[in-house]
């Protein structure tokens, strides 16, 4: 079954590459929307979640304006704590939501179906930590520095891999969180 899925994926990528070769890299629509899976670390816990982002390329150039929203969720197991302290919680639930926007620089390869980009985004992040019915929340300034690459299947669709460093200041404590995201890009508008 895995071999069939992998074979189908390889055929799709090869067919998409051939169809992309018929359109130039500078002929892409100016708006792209990205949605996908995202993994981040937070408070020494791995968090899984989602990410949605949009970018508008000014005059279909290398410069764009990007906004993104993401949510990450997870639990930290404290299995030894209830043994040491009876009645203590056995896990801590974490959630992290980000709302950021800022400039994005994109390089479109003239020879390959690949776009590489970098961005520096600013905004706010919201964290919630809860255990045994008690919770605490904080909203703080955040910034995101990172980038990624799109593999263009055709003029409208692409697959994206993205790696970011998310910096937050929750509970008066500055922390940097690595974040990796994988998903699909859909492009809107008419190429300029």
What positions do the PLM features span?
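Short glycine/proline- and aromatic-enriched beta-strand/turn motifs that initiate or cap beta-hairpins
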Residues: 21-59, 122, 181, 185-192
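Predominantly the C-terminal beta-signal and adjacent terminal strand-loop region
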Residues: 77-78, 151-192
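Residues that define the transmembrane beta-barrel architecture of outer-membrane proteins
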Residues: 29, 46-50, 93-99, 114, ...
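Membrane-spanning beta-strand positions in outer-membrane beta-barrel proteins
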Residues: 32, 62-64, 115, 152, ...
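Transmembrane beta-barrel strands of outer-membrane/channel proteins
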Residues: 33-39, 67-71, 118-124, 147-149, ...
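Gram-negative (and chloroplast) outer-membrane scaffold detector with strong preference
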Residues: 55-132, 140, 181-188
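Bacterial N-terminal signal peptides
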Residues: 7-17
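Outer-membrane beta-barrel domain signature
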Residues: 22-24, 39-45, 88-94, 132-137, ...
């Amino acid at each position: 079954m895995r071999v069939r899925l992998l074979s189908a994926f390889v055929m799709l990528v090869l067919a998409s590459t051939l169809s992309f070769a018929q359109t130039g890299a500078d002929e892409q629509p100016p708006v792209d929307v990205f949605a996908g899976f995202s993994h981040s670390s937070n408070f020494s816990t791995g968090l899984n979640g989602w990410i949605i982002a949009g970018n508008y390329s000014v005059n279909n150039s290398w410069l764009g304006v990007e906004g993104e929203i993401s949510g990450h969720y997870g639990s930290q197991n404290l299995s030894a704590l209830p043994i040491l302290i009876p009645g203590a919680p056995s896990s801590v639930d974490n959630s992290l939501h980000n709302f950021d926007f800022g400039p994005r620089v994109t390089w479109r390869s003239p020879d390959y179906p690949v776009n590489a980009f970098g961005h520096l985004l600013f905004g706010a992040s919201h964290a919630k930590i809860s255990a045994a019915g008690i919770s605490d929340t904080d909203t703080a300034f955040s910034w995101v520095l990172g980038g990624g690459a799109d593999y263009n299947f055709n003029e409208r669709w692409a697959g994206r891999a993205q790696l970011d460093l998310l910096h937050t200041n929750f509970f008066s404590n500055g922390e940097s969180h690595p974040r990796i995201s994988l998903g699909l890009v859909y492009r809107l508008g008419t190429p300029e």
